[in-house]
Amino acid sequence: MPIIKVRENESFDVALRRFKRSCEKSGILSEVRRREFYEKPTTERKRAKASAIKRHIKKLSRENLRRIRLY
């Protein structure tokens, strides 16, 4: 868990904002959302494979678009 030391003469709002930013950088909230409900291992693998396919298609479409612009 991120630790924030409140500086001298620092307002609560600024300290809270720094804490939220550090939590966001460490990925705690996304991890909590991911673990909120149990996901079967097969479902987890299926979701990961689908996202990998989606990333690959997105990458290919960007490369094709770049090739088209070159000509």
Curated annotation (Swiss-Prot):
Keyword Ribosomal protein assigned: yes
Domain of life: Bacteria
UniProt cross-references to InterPro entries, sorted A to Z: Ribosomal_bS21, Ribosomal_bS21_CS, Ribosomal_bS21_sf
Pfam families cross-referenced by the UniProt entry: Ribosomal_S21
UniProt keyword annotations, A-Z: Ribonucleoprotein, Ribosomal protein
Sample GO molecular function, one term: structural constituent of ribosome
Gene3D superfamilies: Ribosomal protein S8 (1.20.5.1150)
The keyword Chloroplast is assigned to this record: no
GO CC field: ribonucleoprotein complex; ribosome
GO biological process: translation
Cross-referenced NCBIfam families: S21p
PANTHER family tied to this protein: MITOCHONDRIAL 28S RIBOSOMAL PROTEIN S21 (PTHR21109), SMALL RIBOSOMAL SUBUNIT PROTEIN BS21 (PTHR21109:SF22)
Membership in a protein family: Belongs to the bacterial ribosomal protein bS21 family.
The name this protein goes by in its record: Small ribosomal subunit protein bS21
